[in-house]
Amino acid sequence: MAASGDPGSAESYRSPLAARYASREMCFLFSDRYKFQTWRQLWLWLAEAEQTLGLPITDEQIQEMKSNLNNIDFQMAAEEEKRLRHDVMAHVHTFGHCCPKAAGIIHLGATSCYVGDNTDLIILRNAFDLLLPKLARVISRLADFAKDRADLPTLGFTHFQPAQLTTVGKRCCLWIQDLCMDLQNLKRVRDELRFRGVKGTTGTQASFLQLFEGDHQKVEQLDKMVTEKAGFKRAFIITGQTYTRKVDIEVLSVLASLGASVHKICTDIRLLANLKEMEEPFEKQQIGSSAMPYKRNPMRSERCCSLARHLMALTMDPLQTASVQWFERTLDDSANRRICLAEAFLTADTILNTLQNISEGLVVYPKVIERRIRQELPFMATENIIMAMVKAGGSRQDCHEKIRVLSQQAAAVVKQEGGDNDLIERIRADAYFSPIHSQLEHLLDPSSFTGRAPQQVHRFLEEEVRPLLKPYGNEMAVKAELCL
């Protein structure tokens, strides 16, 4: 059955990434309009460079191409592709139809991957340029959150069991550190992208060498000129018909790594929401459950986790594609790449938009945190109590045994009776501990159990985070708005 249907209609499937989640600017980058406009721009750049280097191309032909870059007859292109079974040649003919004087020199010396691969590389670069400031904004919002709560003690968890205290700000810095690594990795891969350039059918530049009658220097100049017109600093020296598909592995790997970071962050937020210590933003009219009106589900964090799994899973596509590219090229990369590259960036875009929205409205409940600390801190403070008793003249061994017995009794109240931890009350009631009764409040001050967490937060933000965000200073004011 032939593919059909209007992608914008209710009767046709449309990717939820485009229909529900991703930003308009990211969707446009992967649209047919942007792709085919870029093909035409590449044909223009090629013709301009060929003319400059002496090929018989007129100013009139160049001007005709310039005037029709956006004049795309998509219906004609679709009919041509149906007839020719070749998307690039369909658009060569469509462009030539509105540029009759230039029709004979469009795509001169080039192969399909001249427009296909070079356009993909332009889109990948520009897509990174959309993601980077979004990620920087997420980091900035979380950095502000961490700074404001650098001193707020909270119960730490290892194995999701109560552990030594940390601070809310320090925990947030764990999230920020991962995202900073992602920001650096995305920027590195973006900056290392190289243009495929002007290489011909199998990467040998044979067609261009023939056009320039064996002049190797002009062929190299042509490659360099088009690369510079496209805004790239370097082009591959070696290609087959395509640029190596290992580039796609690099691109999707750093996006998947970002997905892993976001999944961890949003899982933490979901767990903290269950503990009622922290919540993501919850709108006034938002409904958590159709059956349970009291529910305040962390749906934004759940969405991030859901999409992050998809983003991480996409890395298998470029890995397998690169592994099966026989010799100079096989076409079984094409259909797969049409899906995975766009989906990876639209997914990453959605995740960052959503995480920015979360980070701009995180709510903390200090009283709940304080109550949980009170439940666990007495056990954690026992070593400090023993040390204080020894300093007051007591025996370490006798004190240890007293504490052990009282701790077991308090634990039984918590676990078997569902009561509160009353260890401190038991210590206050025991005359043995009278030498330190006046010290108990000080010994149980949560801030004395957080170590250097506040200092670590401020140093980390000042020395690592703020300098990393500096290049994005002009783009920090943008707020994240979610439609759904």
UniProtKB/Swiss-Prot annotation:
SMART domains: ADSL_C (SM00998). Belongs to the lyase 1 family. Adenylosuccinate lyase subfamily. The active site is at 159 (proton donor/acceptor), 289 (proton donor/acceptor). SUPFAM superfamilies: L-aspartase-like. InterPro entries: AdenyloSucc_lyase_C, Fumarate_lyase_CS, Fumarate_lyase_fam, Fumarate_lyase_N, L-Aspartase-like, Pur_lyase. The lineage of its organism: Eukaryota, Metazoa, Chordata, Craniata, Vertebrata. Its EC number is 4.3.2.2. One of its GO terms (cellular component) is cytosol. The keyword Lyase applies. The modification N6-acetyllysine is found at residues 147, 295. It catalyses: N(6)-(1,2-dicarboxyethyl)-AMP = fumarate + AMP; (2S)-2-[5-amino-1-(5-phospho-beta-D-ribosyl)imidazole-4-carboxamido]succinate = 5-amino-1-(5-phospho-beta-D-ribosyl)imidazole-4-carboxamide + fumarate. The modification N-acetylalanine is found at residue 2. One of its GO terms (molecular function) is identical protein binding. Homotetramer. Residues from neighboring subunits contribute catalytic and substrate-binding residues to each active site. The keyword Transit peptide does not apply. It comes from the Eukaryota. There is a cross-link at residue 415 (Glycyl lysine isopeptide (Lys-Gly) (interchain with G-Cter in SUMO1)). This is Adenylosuccinate lyase. Catalyzes two non-sequential steps in de novo AMP synthesis: converts (S)-2-(5-amino-1-(5-phospho-D-ribosyl)imidazole-4-carboxamido)succinate (SAICAR) to fumarate plus 5-amino-1-(5-phospho-D-ribosyl)imidazole-4-carboxamide, and thereby also contributes to de novo IMP synthesis, and converts succinyladenosine monophosphate (SAMP) to AMP and fumarate. It comes from Mus musculus. Pathway: Purine metabolism; AMP biosynthesis via de novo pathway; AMP from IMP: step 2/2; Purine metabolism; IMP biosynthesis via de novo pathway; 5-amino-1-(5-phospho-D-ribosyl)imidazole-4-carboxamide from 5-amino-1-(5-phospho-D-ribosyl)imidazole-4-carboxylate: step 2/2. Keywords: Acetylation, Isopeptide bond, Lyase, Purine biosynthesis, Ubl conjugation.
